[in-house]
Amino acid sequence: MLIIETLPLLRQQIRRLRMEGKRVALVPTMGNLHDGHMKLVDEAKARADVVVVSIFVNPMQFDRPEDLARYPRTLQEDCEKLNKRKVDLVFAPSVKEIYPNGTETHTYVDVPGLSTMLEGASRPGHFRGVSTIVSKLFNLVQPDIACFGEKDFQQLALIRKMVADMGFDIEIVGVPIMRAKDGLALSSRNGYLTAEQRKIAPGLYKVLSSIADKLQAGERDLDEIIAIAGQELNEKGFRADDIQIRDADTLLEVSETSKRAVILVAAWLGDARLIDNKMVELA
């Protein structure tokens, strides 16, 4: 497994792979890898000849400096996991390598609408940072496919729109959420939970599933469903942050013509902001 830290070396390797006619898959990450990331890697391996995993804690997508400062950097352990998975290439650049003149004056990519709604409304600049780094990685790696987790539902929708709008010739693969046995979605942020909070955490998925059951049973008073869910979360020990029921295809409000809904939930548990989602057929 090759570990590359500079743009010139990465370009050199990508040129070689292109000349050899290899099909390349990219898995963009911020490191601190868990089994959910490994599921992305496995999906990439099944679909391509060569798998490139990027590990970069992107300062442009953090709206709070303290979150950036405390985000775990575990490069050595990450590379050991990826080597066991027989990943071909790890791209682990420094911030200086990606943003030589800092982030303030760096050219950015913004996806109107999707970047400022829902999660974007409470985290200003976050999705601009995501679309900027992902488009830069697409330009550098030139992958045939790229794999993203469905846990970050809005991010996946944003990437799909950016790829369509910008004409990237890249297949975007959404990989289903990987969960612990008790239902908690795997996330790097789970590491912020205390042992006691970890016991409470599966309650998020239980509330999510309860909303889904109501929708599937034909209930359509969304305001009431959301209010009850928020109350349930708070009673379980969470601080409900945002609960949305949206059209799964547009992320707009659910309408009479909506075929599928996505339930998006964000809640604080101690110092960890946990997010999860679930799709529901409305037909």
From Swiss-Prot:
Main location: cytoplasm
Binding site for ATP: 30-37, 149-152, 186-189
Keyword Translocase: no
GO molecular function: ATP binding; pantoate-beta-alanine ligase activity
Binding residues annotated for (R)-pantoate, in chain numbering: Q61, Q155
One BP annotation, GO: pantothenate biosynthetic process
Active-site residues (renumbered): H37 (proton donor)
EC numbers, comma separated: 6.3.2.1
Pathway: Cofactor biosynthesis; (R)-pantothenate biosynthesis; (R)-pantothenate from (R)-pantoate and beta-alanine: step 1/1
Keyword S-adenosyl-L-methionine in annotation: no
InterPro entries, per database record: Cyt_trans-like (IPR004821), Pantoate_ligase (IPR003721), Pantoate_ligase_C (IPR042176), Rossmann-like_a/b/a_fold (IPR014729)
Binding residues annotated for beta-alanine, in chain numbering: Q61
Localization (cell): Cytoplasm
Summary of the function given for this chain in its UniProt record: Catalyzes the condensation of pantoate with beta-alanine in an ATP-dependent reaction via a pantoyl-adenylate intermediate.
Record family assignment: Belongs to the pantothenate synthetase family.
Note: The reaction proceeds by a bi uni uni bi ping pong mechanism.
Stored NCBIfam families: cyt_tran_rel (TIGR00125), panC (TIGR00018)
Summary of subunit composition and partner proteins: Homodimer.
Protein name (record): Pantothenate synthetase
Gene name, Swiss-Prot/TrEMBL: panC
